[in-house]
Amino acid sequence: MFYGTHFIMSPPTKSKLKRQSQLLSSMLSRTLSYKYRDLDSTFSSLGASDDPAELSTQLSAPGVLKVFGDSVCTGTHYKSVLATGTSSARELVKEALERYALDPRQAGQYVLCDVVGQAGDAGQRWQARCFRVFGDSEKPLLIQELWKPREGLSRRFELRKRSDVEELAAKEVDTITAGINAQARRLQRSRAKGTPTPALGDARSSPPPRLRRTVSETSLSPVNALPAAAQGPEEPGPDAMRYSLYQSPHLLLLQGYSQQHDSLVYVLNRDRHTVGQRTPSSKPSISLSAPDILPLHCTIRRQPLPDSGQAAGRLVLEPIPGAHISVNFSEVGHRTVVLHHGDLLSLGLYYLLLFKDPAQAQPLPARALARLRAVPQSCRLCGAALGARGAASPTQAALPRRQQLLLEFEPHLEDTLLQRIMTLIEPGGDDHKLTPAFLLCLCIQHSATHFQPGTFGQLLLKIARLIRETVWEKTKELAEKQAQLQEPISLASCAMADLVPDLQPILFWMSNSIELLYFIQQKCPLYMQSMEEQLDITGSKESLFSCTLTASEEAMAVLEEVVLYAFQQCVYYVSKSLYICLPALLECPPFQTERRESWSSAPELPEELRRVVSVYQAALDLLRQLQVHPEVASQMLAYLFFFSGTLLLNQLLDRGPSLSCFHWPRGVQACARLQQLLEWMRSAGFGAAGEHFFQKLSCTLNLLATPRAQLIQMSWTALRAAFPALSPAQLHRLLTHYQLASAMGPMSTWEPGAQDSPEAFRSEDVLESYENPPPIVLPSDGFQVDLEANCLDDSIYQHLLYVRHFLWGLRSRASPGSPGRPGSGASQPVCPEGMHHVVLDGHLEAPSCPLAPRDPGPAAREVAPERTLPLRGAPWAQAPPGRQPSRGGSQAGPPHTDSSCLLTPPSTPLGPEPGDPDWPESGGPCGKALPERQRNGLSGLRGAAPEGDSAALAEESPPAPSSRSSSTEDFCYVFTVELERGPSGLGMGLIDGMHTHLGAPGLYIQTLLPGSPAAADGRLSLGDRILEVNGSSLLGLGYLRAVDLIRHGGKKMRFLVAKSDVETAKKIHFRTPPL
């Protein structure tokens, strides 16, 4: 309704129509001018005439590009294609191929070229001077706008074959520029190494000496005679480099790091050479590229002889502090070493060089030849063969490889170890979900390679049965919980949020069983082959071999049973949730309005569809969280799609008439819901599976969504052709119950033909069967557990270290550190009591504690009682693979203490003694503050450090697994503590476990100062063991170095601590009064 002036509508006149058409045409022309404004602005300065330098474009025909194709199609000059400023070269190639009647799908075999040449007069051919190939994504018209050919030359775009262009480019090799750059590189190398380089003219006449590729005259064979040119001084000429090898000492590379950067010979013809790694701030004269080489690693200088007035003298090597240098496989340390002919220099972990002095003119000494034979053929860092490592990139070689992954245990600890691994990981935690499979594979590997033949077969059976029992118990608990739900089943009773925690352990062990099954299938034949060879050697019977083979086959069958059973149980319970929420997709009212927020860019899913999608998404998230193999996860989703599609189709065909689903509005609504569901499946990566298992339902809904006017015109034959996925019985069911109008029945044209009549009236063929689900196929690749992998997940490695620590605890319980065996009769060396530190301040002026302590005076001396060292029964004697316990010899008598390490004030108490009221009991609070009466009860420093204290820890230090992965009641509980230094430091008194009654290596807490950060944390207690400091493991560190690492760890520090039981804490704390 209009308010105000009333308008009278009348048909327009011819003049008005003409005027409107003119306005419309002018508007369209302005619109087009905006589109090509950028393109036309290029030629605006050229006037109305065409540019003679541009042969492929014309101002009079903007947007038209001439592509010349003489080399592609003989007899054709050019073809015109439409182009804009944003057209890419790839698109123009396709358009040009269509214009030349060639297949556009072969566009990869052609390229568009920007050719600059000279267009002759009439009748003369085009002469190309140079050309450039356009990249596929380049914009030819934009490049044409940015640069122009110089005056007198023209430019045109040509279509050429890629093979012709590559052949032409291969013929034109720029030898002049390459020679200049090669000479520049030679000059740069000669300046870096201090060696003369021949002139450019001489280099062309004679090839340069190939020092980087051949041993040349510096081979290991003896030098028989010096050349005549070396007998007198001579100006450097073309052979100066070759002669300098006879005149000057040099280093011959035997083992290097990088074939690309290392030189074979380093000539020492200066008074001073610096050796190191080249950095922006350091440019040594001898550059080495290994990562463990310091920017300034060492210095080699010429030292004049004291009794000789000649300038020539001997060469000495001066190491830099912190550099790893060995001469003849002996550590240099901080001392200066005189180099002799035939010495072997080891720089870092990679470089091995032979020092040769031609002035001595003698064969290599016999000791040098013996050392050469003893050169290790493997890398001292990673153990890899040096020949195989040569092709490795510096980045890969710079990363230290993880040590060999082993899990050693004794046969009597097998059951306890398996039980600990089975309960190590909580399925709902944050740890790596395949940790049990990895650890169990390590157990199988150790049993097969170290135990008696046939033992690992029983271990396989034991593992498989444990997993089966665990899965059975979890599914039994889930079934009992589901049975307690109230009937009838509702949406609230079968929510996925309540179902996920119960499905986690089942899927968790299904995932680990898949990895274990593949490992057994791959490794068991190798173990059996090795076992067969051992049985042949020992002459055993075949019964043991057959029993082991039978046990392994039975174990694989049990694991397959676990996988299939867990798969079935998970599908059953998820399908139970789908059974409740799927029918709502068909029962929703037609054309209901969807709520959508004003800021929402896309409509939200309707509630009934959102519930279905949430079930799929929860199942998918659960499979990915528990790291189920992707193929198995896809098969489980496919099974859920099969169930959903079959259920919806059967409900539609069975209950469709009663739900009023067989008419057009409901068909359109249900079809839209299905399309939204399929769109989600495509976004989740399961589009193909969704379309396959929902094909019949989609076909049914498309029929119901067909407009009535179109549907009544279709015959039975046409409907069969339009909806081929439906069987005759299903199509007949839909057509006979389709609701055209209130008084109209089915059309006569919908009657089935004579050929389909028998099948159309079979009522048993209407509903789909659930008996043909997609098959469950175990995967054959894509597994994650690999014991030989170079890179291992940190979480798995942490739990491996934890299990090693757990085994160490079992061994220490079985054989506690006690004095020597009675009746041995052998005299044992005495062991002084270990040093005791309270970490107070990390910023001390005193240097770090040396391994050879100084005598601070008699006031700081105490003598510990003599006791024997534990031998076979000691836990530290059972070292893990690849590590031997080593300890410096202890000396009897009063030990010396370094004054720089006396961090404990004289009034610091050492904590309660066993039996005192304040001694912590089992389960009591950790880190309880000491009573006031004990603060000044003791004075003086107890304990001392023996000389040469370099004890190596004999067991692995386990980083902490997640808090949900380990029971707090276990004495091997590992946790992380972050402490910040206070005014008095950290407030922890530390002691070496080897100097206590525990008799095991390690850094243990012996005291906690009241009110200190360590006591205030509340988790630390006496007897706890420090495993890591700021991520640095204390494995292999001596006591003094470990304490020094803590002292200089910064203001905020992070400790990895292993909780000890009360018995261990008593052994750590108990001290005998000094004699």
From Swiss-Prot:
Pfam families: DIL, FHA, PDZ, RA. One of its GO terms (cellular component) is microtubule. Interacts with RAP1A; in a GTP-dependent manner. Does not interact with members of the Ras family. Interacts (via PDZ domain) with KIF14; is recruited to the microtubule network restricting its interaction with activated RAP1A. PROSITE patterns: DILUTE, PDZ, RA. SUPFAM superfamilies: PDZ domain-like, SMAD/FHA domain, Ubiquitin-like. Residues 314-389 form the FHA domain. One of its GO terms (biological process) is signal transduction. The modification Phosphoserine is found at S206, S216, S219, S221, S393, S890. Residues 183-237, 872-967 are annotated as: Disordered. Residues 497-764 form the Dilute domain. It comes from Homo sapiens (Human). This is Ras-associating and dilute domain-containing protein. PANTHER family: DILUTE DOMAIN-CONTAINING PROTEIN YPR089W, RAS-ASSOCIATING AND DILUTE DOMAIN-CONTAINING PROTEIN. Disulfide bonds: none annotated. Residues 61-164 form the Ras-associating domain. Belongs to the RADIL family. Keywords: Cell adhesion, Developmental protein, Phosphoprotein. GO terms for molecular function: GTPase binding. Residues 225-234, 950-967 have a biased composition (Low complexity). Gene3D superfamilies: 2.30.42.10, 2.60.200.20, Phosphatidylinositol 3-kinase Catalytic Subunit, Chain A, domain 1. Residues 976-1061 form the PDZ domain. Downstream effector of Rap required for cell adhesion and migration of neural crest precursors during development.
